[in-house]
From Swiss-Prot:
Reported tissue expression: Ubiquitously expressed, with elevated levels in Purkinje cells, the olfactory bulb, and Leydig cells of the testis.
UniProt cross-references to SMART domains, sorted A to Z: DKCLD, PUA
Catalytic activity: uridine in 5S rRNA = pseudouridine in 5S rRNA
Region (Nucleolar localization): 2-21
Keywords: Acetylation, Isomerase, Isopeptide bond, Nucleus, Phosphoprotein, Ribonucleoprotein, Ribosome biogenesis, RNA-binding, rRNA processing, Ubl conjugation
InterPro entries per record: Dyskerin-like, PsdUridine_synth_cat_dom_sf, PsdUridine_synth_N, PUA, PUA-like_sf, PUA_sf, tRNA_PsdUridine_synth_B_fam, TruB_C
UniProt family annotation: Belongs to the pseudouridine synthase TruB family.
Organism lineage: Eukaryota, Metazoa, Chordata, Craniata, Vertebrata
Ranges where the PUA domain occurs: 297-372
Positions where N-acetylalanine occurs in the chain: A2
One Gene Ontology MF term: box H/ACA snoRNA binding
Stretches with biased composition (Basic residues): 10-19, 466-476
Entry protein name: H/ACA ribonucleoprotein complex subunit DKC1
Length: 509
């Protein structure tokens, strides 16, 4: 037999496709096309949520209290809401034009979008341009927090006389940092009182010595008057100065680089939707309100607890799924659903360490509810007692308010505690006071025994002391009562007679 020849063919190596980095537009399309949802699991799965949108970004880095909950087919991802709800729960990062006032601009947008309510993140003077956050309908609940957020400006100051180079101007800007006294300008909508405003950082960008113009950048507290700052700059330099031009670069979380749009963009987007039913441009112009809350610490609640919070219930620990690191007491946080919707703004009552070690208690108190009521179904009042109460109301054993009637069984009256009643907690208080009364009775018995033992040893001493005390108390009571007995009356009459005698003697003299 001839030796068999083995022929080997070279293996074809599959070429790995080079993954191109996603552009911003592609990411937006993916976020809109795909489904983003936290699924209930018994084990914690490893997720890559760095590309998840808005409040669900880096969701896997949150601390897990429990991963088990019952998902409800209610609510939706903020980016996938219906266009009507999307606009009513959104905001616009508007590039305010020069000349119209902030209120005029907001009124125009309300008319263009045909909504009932709009608000803005802080008034800009008519000549000032730049970032103006316009909140629509439900998003107006975040207006106050946006108005108090920090702001950044780029301005031009005109000096009345020339100075030697721009170093003096930059030094003067550095001195005008920190807490400063400011009085509003002559033409202002508020009372011209002295107020303290903080300037966090400022730097000079450019100075033109020929035209005596300086461009500067300022990061400051809300309510700072840049016009007043320019006047102070001129006073520091000794030449005088005034503000020539101003633009707001950042308001809160949003800056001029974060999808800023003009009034024409809003008008065109609404026209396209009205005439061609193309909502893609409206979704580019309007952004969900959750984008304003991305800098806050997050608490994730179960779906069954969402509607209770919308009705004002306390944020309790059993309804918590996940929580973020670094939560401090009295810090402003945002409470979200598993789909990334903002439920409310809250004030934390527990730190992250306390949340991780406790199994009950109030985590936070509500500051402002954002979500509409009954977006999720009611899940309270489904316990055994509540269900029994509903059945008894249907059967006529209780009235329509759940109060006992003549037909109510005696066992129900004895066992059931009505916490909503005005005379509530009677049984509870008795149950709480019972051990206290028992303890007091034991203490009284012990005291009696101690006193009896003391009386057996020295019976005469305590009796003498008691008698002395009684004797001492009698004259005190008489004096305090203001002369109830006859002796007191005699003393007063004697004093009156003496006074009369003295008066008669003086008259005779």
């Amino acid at each position: 037999m001839a030796d068999a020849e083995v022929i080997t063919f070279p293996k074809k190596h599959k070429k790995k496709k080079d993954r191109k980095p996603l552009q911003e537009d592609d990411v937006a399309e993916i976020q809109h096309a795909e489904e983003f949802l936290i699924k209930p699991e018994s084990k914690v799965a490893q997720l890559d949520t760095s590309q998840w949108p808005l409040l669900l970004k880096n969701f896997d880095k949150l601390n897990v209290r429990t991963a088990h909950y019952t998902p409800l087919p209610c609510g939706s991802n903020p980016l996938k809401r219906e266009i009507g709800d999307y606009i009513r729960t959104g905001f616009i990062n508007l590039d305010k034009p020069s000349n119209p006032s902030s209120h005029e601009v907001v009124a125009w947008i309300r008319r263009i979008l045909r909504v009932e309510k709009t608000g803005h993140s802080g008034t800009l003077d008519p000549k000032v341009t730049g970032c103006l956050i316009v909140c629509i309908e439900r998003a107006t609940r975040l207006v106050k927090s946006q108005q108090s957020a920090g702001k950044e400006y780029v301005g031009i100051v005109r000096l009345h006389n020339a100075i030697e180079g721009g170093t003096q101007l930059s030094r003067a800007l550095e001195t005008l940092t920190g807490a400063l006294f400011q009085r509003p300008p002559l033409i202002a909508a508020v009372k011209r009182q002295l107020r303290v405003r903080t300037i966090y950082e400022s730097k000079m960008i450019e100075y033109d010595p020929e035209r005596r113009l300086g461009i500067f950048w300022v990061s400051c507290e809300a309510g700072t008057y840049i016009r007043t700052l320019c006047v102070h700059l001129g006073l520091l330099l000794g030449v005088g100065g005034q503000m020539q031009e101003l633009r707001r670069v950042r308001s809160g979380v949003m800056s001029e680089k974060d999808h800023m749009v003009t009034m024409h963009d809003v008008l065109d987007a609404q026209w396209l939707y009205d005439n061609h039913k193309d909502e893609s441009y409206l979704r580019r112009v309007v952004y969900p309100l959750e984008k304003l809350l991305t800098s806050h610490k997050r608490l994730v609640m179960k779906d069954s607890a969402v509607n209770a919070i919308c009705y004002g219930a306390k944020i309790m620990l059993p309804g918590l799924l996940r929580y973020e690191d670094g939560i401090e007491v009295n810090q402003e946080i945002v409470v979200i659903t598993t789909k990334g919707e903002a439920i409310c703004m809250a004030i934390a009552l527990m730190t992250t360490a306390v949340i991780s070690t406790c199994d009950h208690g109030i985590v936070a108190k509500i500051k402002r509810v954002i979500m509409e009521r009954d977006t999720y179904p009611r899940k309270w009042g489904l316990g055994p007692k509540a269900s029994q109460k509903k059945m008894m109301i249907k059967q006529g054993l209780l009235d329509k308010h759940g109060k006992p009637t003549d037909n109510t069984p005696a066992t129900w009256k004895q066992d059931y505690i009505d916490y909503s009643d005005s005379g509530k907690n009677t049984l509870v208080t008795e149950a709480v006071q019972a051990p206290q009364l028992a303890a007091e009775a034991v203490n009284v018995i012990k005291r009696k025994r101690d006193s009896e033992s003391e009386s057996d040893e020295t019976p005469t001493v305590p009796q003498l002391k008691e008698k002395k005390k009684k004797k001492d108390k009698k004259p005190k009571t008489v004096l305090e009562s203001g002369g109830e007995t006859g002796d007191g009356d005699n003393d007063t009459t004697k004093k009156k007679k003496k006074k009369k005698v003295k008066v008669v003697e003086e008259m005779s003299e």
